[in-house]
Amino acid sequence: MSPRHERELENFAARVRACRICVENPVGQPLPHEPRPVLRPSSSARILIASQAPGTKVHMSGMPFTDASGDRLRDWLAVSSDEFYDTTKFAIVPMGFCFPGQDAKGGDLPPRRECAAAWRAPLMALMPRIDLVLTIGLYAQSWHMGAARRPSLTETVMDWRTIWDAPSTPKVLPLPHPSWRNTGWLKRNPWFEMDLLPFLRSEIRFRLG
């Protein structure tokens, strides 16, 4: 990409990082803490990690996936931390940019709806080299896959070959969230590690060169 395009993305990302929509003009209840948008867009990366929203550790660090979920995701991708955080290789743009808070049971709330509505389409337009989108969880799958998303996350991920073979650009691979909460899901669905992960790793390595 040209320096002009890089500057345009940098300027737009700076606007996102200064966003306060969920406090000043929220949909429903306002964000219960000070916003701290976390994203790593890229004008040169070919791979987009479309995740859900930061958790508590990421809210503190200001870097995506600096937690156990990140360790598991990097293992799924078979990449090092240096590769993962290299913005010439990966763009990381969650559906919600700020930690949304927790529910009464201690689980993270869904991504804030304001983020995608305000920012996602123009961000995608500024990342034209993306040719593989890893949709992590239902919210990313709904936005990036539309009608191609199946009724449940399990059905969507299970049907990854059909989704991959569809004539769409960029290519999409649906994934569950790498949270420890999904360890049981992984045990109940051994095909994920046996079939999908080897294919995913080969596509990642192909794009990283």
Each predicted region: which residue ranges?
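A polyanion-binding, active-site-adjacent surface
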Residues: 2-208
